[in-house]
Amino acid sequence: MPVTKCPRKVEPPWKGWDRKAQKNGLRHQVFAVNGDHYVGEWKGNLKHGKGTQVWKKSGAVYEGDWKFGKRDGYGSLSHPDPETGKLRRVYSGWWKGDKKSGYGIQFFGPKEYYEGEWCNNQRSGWGRMYYNNGDIYEGQWQNDKPEGEGMLRLKNGNRYEGIWERGMKNGHGRFFHLDHGQLFEGYWVDNVAKCGTMIDFGRDEAPEPTQFPIPKVEILDPDGVLKEALDKLMKPEEEEG
């Protein structure tokens, strides 16, 4: 009686190739078709865990946390300096879904940087900005601009404390002219002081005091006059139709 043998099941070669191509755990270096390369941890064929990504075209380098193929967690981004070619750190902080989110520091230049909160790659929340000209802004941000309460301290020591909107002084605020020994308190519209009061403030200690002190207000109801002017500014009369 003939003996029948069942053929041994052989795994197709492509299955082995596919299994070897699946990236999980630590890989020393993986290159993309465009020349980008990544060194670090993988999960389910996606960058996941700690890793370093280098973009060939821009030369940018990211070192930090990844989650399912996106920068997520804490990490640093560096770009090559256009003059020296050396890597220069441009951001260190938290990421979410491949975007800057949470607390982080962004370097715009050698002396210009921002430290504070981010949301979707924009400065949003509380933050402090150091400008190249020596000015410093500290306060609230929204959509990458000062928005809400904040203080701008100028290089010469003068400062504004008050409300900001769309990156400009808008609303109630106080401007300390410490170089001249005066204080203005009032209402701003798009960086222009519209109405308010000016008083002497630390005039005796000011480096460049005004020639004469501010005279006493002689009108009967200065507060009422100021309130009336402010009301008109806040609620302009409707144009006659």
Swiss-Prot record:
One GO term of the biological process aspect: negative regulation of signal transduction by p53 class mediator
In this chain, the stretch annotated as Interaction with TP53 covers 206-240
Q: Where are the MORN repeats?
A: 38-60, 62-84, 91-113, 114-136, 137-159, 160-182, 184-205
Q: Which organism is it from?
A: Mus musculus
What gene is this protein a product of?
Morn3
CC annotations in GO? acrosomal vesicle
Q: Where is this region: Interaction with MDM2?
A: 6-35
Enumerate the PANTHER family for this protein.
Answer: MORN REPEAT-CONTAINING PROTEIN 3 (PTHR46511:SF1)
What lineage does the source organism belong to? Eukaryota, Metazoa, Chordata, Craniata, Vertebrata
UniProt entry tagged with the keyword Hydrolase: no
In its UniProt record, a GO molecular function of this protein is: protein-macromolecule adaptor activity
* Name listed for the protein in its UniProt record: MORN repeat-containing protein 3
Against InterPro entries, the record matches this protein to:
MORN (IPR003409), MORN3 (IPR052472)
| Subunit note | Interacts with MEIG1. Interacts with TP53, MDM2 and SIRT1; the interactions mediate post-transcriptional modifications of TP53 by MDM2 and SIRT1.
Instruction: Give compartment(s).
Output: Cytoplasmic vesicle, Secretory vesicle, Acrosome
Annotated tissue distribution? Expressed in testis (at protein level).
